[in-house]
Amino acid sequence: MAYTALELITRAYYLSQVISRELQVPSGTQITDGLYLLNAIIDFKNSDLREIPYYQEFVFNAVQGQEKYDIPGLLTVDSLTFNIGPVRYAMNEETRTSYFANYRIDNVQSLPFQYRVERTLDGADIYIYFVPADVYVMKLWGKFQLTEAALTTDLTQFYDLFYIEFLRHQLAVWICSEYGASVPDLVKENYEILQKKIMDVSPPDLSIRSLNYFGNDPGLDWQIINLSGGWLPY
């Protein structure tokens, strides 16, 4: 069953108690304001990734000799790998200082093993090193920008019903702020409960994998990458 943005806006107005459910129907400026606020909420979530519960896979081809790749709509990357045939290789994310300010030999073409993600307008740039020596199929898992809505947009095509309910409560809070009204206590309480639950839907992977240069397993360094061609007996 479709759940349009117009229906969400209408229900948010009733929830905010700015208009009466039995006596009024939002129209005109109220609908325009509601759509603006809804899209402002959706856009603002790009700055607080904890409130975006959806991870997506994105596949692109690395180009021989190219370090930088523009990924539209990308917000953050959890993992980045590449394939040579059926064999998958992992890559390590570097800090900005480590990637851009550390010593290294530029333009070395080999198997990439490091990457750095930098946010840009409406997306992100991914930098990889070593510069690819061939065309590799890159696979990333990350979070992308949420889809903005028109009045007729069926929100169930993009969001779960629990997330739509969260948006309805948040929109009700913003409507109260826009119209100078007090947020009903129960609405505020339910919104805070929903917000906490949303952050627990898909928490980030905070596990740590360490490389031990003094243990039984080999560490990943420049010599291994270049001398072995990246083929390790894992």
List PLM regions with ranges.
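Glycine-enriched, solvent-exposed interface loops adjoining structured elements
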Residues: 1-234
